Amino acid sequence: MNDKIELTDGNIIIRPCRLEDAAVICEGVQESMQEMLKWAPWCHPDYAISDCKSWLDSRHQMWSEGIEYDFVIFDPKGSTFLGGCAIDQINRKHNFANLGYWVRTSQEGKGVATAAVKLISRFGFETLGFTRLEIVAAVQNKASQRVAEKVGAVREGIHRNRHVVHDKIYDSVMYSLIPKQR
């Protein structure tokens, strides 16, 4: 993983996750637990710093092997943790991947996710060379759908039974971004 990667639009910074981010990520997850439990299968009521450290331990290898690219989102000074975004579920044969994001509860409604999606999609297209990025949001997750629409993603339809989160099955809206749309 390249620790030198740092993308910014002047309002936020996204950069690869680091082990030293564990405390602030865990704090953000715990603050946002009520919302995260609905949409994040990895989140659970007892989420602790040990969970975060275990996850972070695997990020370097995932990045190095081209399996997943996880970023943290910070304010422009790099001092306040705002959320996370990732390119994952990569399909090399057809050259596309999933793009996911979350913003801690105290930072919602400030354009953080929209800005992060713009930055990470540029990375996905220009650096990684993907020809398509997909944003999949549960039908009930209106906030994620708004972000997809704000960045110009095209709504392609409803995928039935697309998400399973804590044994609940959700239909999801499929959005796509392609390089020309940005």
Question: Which residues make up each language-model segment?
Answer:
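A short hydrophobic/aromatic micro-motif that marks alpha-helical segments and, especially, helix-coil
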Residues: 36, 47-48, 63, 182
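A short helix-loop-beta-strand connector motif used in the catalytic cores of GNAT acetyltransferases and
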Residues: 43-44, 57-72
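Acyl-donor (CoA/ACP) binding surface of acyl/acetyltransferases
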Residues: 1-24, 28-35, 70-182
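Short, charged low-complexity intrinsically disordered segments located at boundaries
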Residues: 52-61, 83-91
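Conserved GNAT-fold acetyl-CoA-binding loop/helix
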Residues: 37-58
